[in-house]
Amino acid sequence: MKITNSNKDAIICLAAGKSQEQIIIKAKSLGYIVVAIDRDQASPGFKYADIKICQSTYDADAIIRELEFLKNEYRWIGVLNRSSGPPVITAARICEYFEIPGISIESAQNLVNKDKLRESCLKYGIPSPAYKIYSTNERETVFSNKFPIVVKPALSLIGKSGISVARSENELKS
């Protein structure tokens, strides 16, 4: 579906927290209408946005439903997202639904899921560190006698969260 009937260029900003304030301010200074989306009604970026949507940035379907009400009033020209987690997928889904140029859903999923990211790097010849995908049940036998190791979840919600170093089997088990 192509958005028509509008001469108001609008940018969708996924999240309105402290780290998004400058993005919202800059978009406004460039003359764009800013639709800010955040689950926290007290998000500081909301005070700069033209339109505020209180919704989780993880819930693409709910956000798309909200944006549907606005699509005839504004021309969506971009989706901004400073996250490296699940909101990247939300941004891709919004872009696809409203035919806004942006990252593909597959690329977004590859970016968010570290296993998929490494597989994609390998497929396209992009160097990346050696890794092993394993389940919780396998980990004690797979890595025995190869310590220290770095353990990182495939789906980290915030940057480097969940990373740990195991120097022994006991540390790996805990």
Describe each region flagged by the PLM:
Residues M1-S107:
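ATP-binding N-terminal substructure of ATP-dependent carboxylate-amine bond-forming enzymes
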Residues A62, I89, T141, G159-K160:
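Glycine/Thr-rich phosphate-binding loops of Rossmann-like dinucleotide-binding domains
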Residues K52-Y58, Y131-T136, S164-R167:
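Short acidic-hydrophobic, aromatic-tinged amphipathic segments that line or gate anion-handling sites
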Residues E96, A108-P129, T136, E140-V142:
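Glycine-/Pro-rich loop/turn segments that contact NAD(P) or position catalytic residues
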